[in-house]
């Protein structure tokens, strides 16, 4: 076998192995960013929008007469409904609004519909023979909410040539559970425009 043929025979596999090794050794850099910084990667719903909505809505609701009455009203929070054409984690919006309201210290929260199964399962578990009856939570002790917070997020998307305009609107309402009266309502609007080119 000639030296040239042997060299050709091993050259391609050696070249592929070297390329794979070089790709595997490529340096990957990870850095921390400011979680509160403005996110401008895309014009889709993002972390900046989530923070702005939660803070704005909580600030507004904490000024509502039903809340400032001073008796720490009990609120249940329904998951914000997504009426946009894109996937938006509305549970994250709902949880962020609840967290901002909780920080305000003016409301208490009753278990919501999504958490009811876990709550009743825990009560049933404590009713088993494995728990001390004197310390176990009894059925019929849960507190009902005085108010129900609910809402939705909608969007309008327009495209013209290299311009994409996205308008989001989040609307929340606080309903009195006892009498069905609307106690508070507000909305937060966000507009994002992207130009290609």
Listing of model-derived features with the role each one plays in the protein:
Residues 26-29, 146-196:
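Amphipathic beta-strand/beta-sheet edge segments enriched in Tyr/Trp
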Residues 140-144:
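Extracellular/periplasmic catalytic domains that process cell-envelope and extracellular macromolecules
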Residues 64-69, 139, 160-162:
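Surface-exposed acidic, glycine-flexible loop patches that form ligand/cofactor-binding
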